[in-house]
Amino acid sequence: MFSPRSIRHCRACGAPTAYREPPDDNRERAICSACGTIHYENPINVVGTVPVFEGKVLLCLRNIEPRRGFWTLPAGFMELNETTEQGAVRETVEEAGAKIVLGPLLTLLNVPHVGQVHLYYRAEMTSAALDPGPETIEARLFDESEIPWDELAFKTVKVTLERFFADRRRGQFAVHCADIA
């Protein structure tokens, strides 16, 4: 189970915190020793897309750790003051320079061992033009038969692509929820 215990000082006053269970709660939280502020640690949202152009799926070769040199869908951490949809579009532009029309949600994947929830949306690219950003070594379109399955960066990417291609073959897309160990 993911347990970072990373809050050492209060964000409100700067005093040290201690982990203990607040009254009427059922788990330990970082509590300020001076002002009593309770700090909650919650999962981080990762948002991304499955961009498609003329039947091919866009993948990005990672230029950052973790998993530098492995292929991924364009995705990243959601920022404050943006929706999941806005974050997915932003990450697609930042990582691949792809212009897209966002479609519906495809996968919602719980990744509790790293404290994350991943949301991937289907997307149609408006052109094949790509302009990868600094986090990407290369961005490229792949037919299903060309997907480098053994070189994918994360299990969430593999699961999302498997669901996408299965739905596409069936001719009907659904929203898929899964827990990733």
Model-derived features with residue positions:
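Beta-strand-connecting loop/turn residues
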Residues: 28, 54-56, 128
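Unchanged
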Residues: 78-101, 105-163, 167, 171-174, ...
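A generic structural signal for short beta-strands and their flanking turns/coil linkers
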Residues: 28, 45-47, 67-69, 98-101, ...
